[in-house]
Amino acid sequence: MSNTILQKARDYEEEHSAAISAAERPAYHLTPYVGWMNDPNGFSFYHGKYHLFYQYNPYATQWGPMHWGHAVSTDLLHWEYLPCAIAPDSTSDNGPGCFSGSATEMDDGRQLLMYTSVVSEKQPNGEMRDIQTQSVAVGDGLDYEKPACNPVLTQKDLPEGYSKFDFRDPKIWREADGTYSAVTVALTEDGSGAAVLFQSKDGFDWHFVTVLARNNNVYGKMWECPDFFPLDGKHVLMVGPMEMRPSGEFHNGHNVIAFVGSYDEKTHTFTREQVQLVDGGIDFYATQTTQAPDGRRLMTAWLQTWSDTEDKPQGCKWFGQTICPRELHLKDGRIVQTPVRELDAAHGKRTLHENVTVQNETVLAGIGGRIADLTVTVAAGEYRSFTVKLAADAAYHTRLTYDPYTSLLTLDRSCAGSRADIVHTRSCKVRSQNGALKLRILLDKNSVEVFVNDGEQTMTAWIYTPQSADGITFAADGQATITVEQFELNL
């Protein structure tokens, strides 16, 4: 099969991308070149730029045959679109398409993409089923070729009893000695997921190493979108569990969870020591990390979940976006997240209100807008609740409410203009500090990202509220003393 399918996608991009103006996109969150985006893929630093690929249907604002969209950036805020990287145009991926994967640099300077290749195959009972294998493509950062050795991993490379129908999402990296490693997820004989490690000397000939972790039906069923990386002296395994019932902090339906533990590189043994929810908001899935040239561990994710993909503004020309990339660290054995420091370099006009006492709904001069970096610090006190309204006018708002007695922070977009039959609220329990609370809030037209107490928790959601609703207000039940700092963003 020739690459005419890829060229068709590239021609479509060139013809239709001009119909989407910069004003119709977020200011610093990546959206698809055209059409639909879901999982971010191939997040990497290659030849002086950050590369971010993504699951992509260029032809419609809904899921369809999966291609890989492609964009590059030098600062993680401004993204340049490149032509579609790969398309379902080979015998190993000519079914639903080229599913999620990752990227790394090869010894010869080429970039290696590793992805889940899917074909539809007739089963003995006559049923058509999608078979998932892993394939590679090699290129120069713009154009990629699929070698004849594809697929490079199939069911025969898995432990006995693992499913060929659920075997996907390879995350690839290079070891210190140059070895290629990749973690995938697969469905085990007990009907739940496992993280499986493979290795290769050249990136093409792969072999099974070990099962890093099994779910054993504890955290949902099948796992998706694995990542495995060192962080501040520990190792982290991130996965997206499917069909996970609410339990404790794991309550947002499409969780991303992180196991923090110790990894023995000689025996390839990962010992889990604790587990946590990665984001407690409404719209956050399919994480992927990379290491920056300066050593920082950076994370991106899909700012969406599968349960509300039909809720989009009428006439929208694109669908799906990624989060503002985040820096990851460990604090007391748990992951903390902060916006990438590149965002600080975009800070423009600063507005500061210190030690303001609020009770009834309060508007502060110079505080507002839909593109902003806002920090709200609430002093310890005896107030009963505190609320920030974002993207607000007489008809719309998204609300953050903190109850110091239960230590619950609630994100509520029920008045944001979304449909009535999707999830509107999520709550997370934050560290109790006698009412003291710090919220850093990133606004970007269609989204809100909240970093609680310097990133100990985060909450993320899209908000398809009319852009004219740009007010920000503060209120308390009782009296709360707050300091508010807002930076406009020069983007």
Residue ranges: model-predicted function:
Residues M1-D169, R174-V218, P230-D279, L303-H353, ...:
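Beta-rich carbohydrate-recognition and catalytic domains
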Residues R10-E15, V260-L491:
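Beta-rich accessory regions
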Residues F229-P230, Q479:
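Juxtamembrane/interface motifs at transmembrane-helix termini
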